[in-house]
């Protein structure tokens, strides 16, 4: 059963969904169950995928990887998400953008998640 804020991907068409309200049935796309994208469960290099959380004046700066992640046409970060105080904040990226996002929020505990088009879903907590 899908749970709140889990991310799922269709292995056929590539549709990706984030669960806003978990119901009682599995998610299906193209006639088959969608794959749950578990954070950090692929073979991507950790130093290029695990979000780095930095508390800065006015909010949080999230950088993807301790070594900057490529942002090329065939390999890029699709989005960066910050979870804090029961809220979700998302910045969508495209090839050529910097693999980082600033979120102007005041929270003491946050979780940062990102999605790489080749290596899936990754997260870090402060």
UniProtKB/Swiss-Prot annotation:
Gene Ontology biological process terms, A to Z: removal of superoxide radicals
What would you give as a GO molecular function for this chain, any one? superoxide reductase activity
Catalytic reactions on record: reduced [rubredoxin] + superoxide + 2 H(+) = oxidized [rubredoxin] + H2O2
Cross-referenced SUPFAM superfamilies: Rubredoxin-like, Superoxide reductase-like
Would the keyword Nucleus turn up in this protein's UniProt record?
A: no
The enzyme's E.C. designation: 1.15.1.2
**Which amino acid positions bind Fe cation 1, per UniProt?**
10, 13, 29-30
**Extra notes?**
Catalysis occurs at center II. Fe(2+) ion of center II is the electron donor and is converted to the Fe(3+) form during the reaction.
Subunit structure comment from the entry: Homodimer.
The protein depicted here goes by the name: Desulfoferrodoxin
Originating gene: dfx
């Amino acid at each position: 059963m899908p749970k709140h804020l889990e991310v799922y991907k269709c292995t056929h068409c590539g549709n990706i969904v984030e669960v806003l309200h978990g119901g009682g049935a599995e998610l299906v796309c193209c006639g088959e169950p969608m794959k749950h994208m578990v954070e950090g469960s692929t073979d991507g290099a950790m130093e290029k995928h695990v979000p780095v959380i930095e508390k800065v004046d006015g909010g949080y700066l999230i950088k993807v990887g301790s070594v900057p992640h490529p942002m090329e046409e065939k390999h890029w970060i699709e989005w960066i998400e910050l979870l804090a105080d029961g809220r979700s904040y998302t910045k969508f990226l495209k090839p050529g953008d910097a693999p980082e996002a600033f979120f102007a929020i005041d929270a003491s505990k946050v979780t940062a998640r990102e999605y790489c088009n080749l290596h899936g879903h990754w997260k870090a907590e402060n």
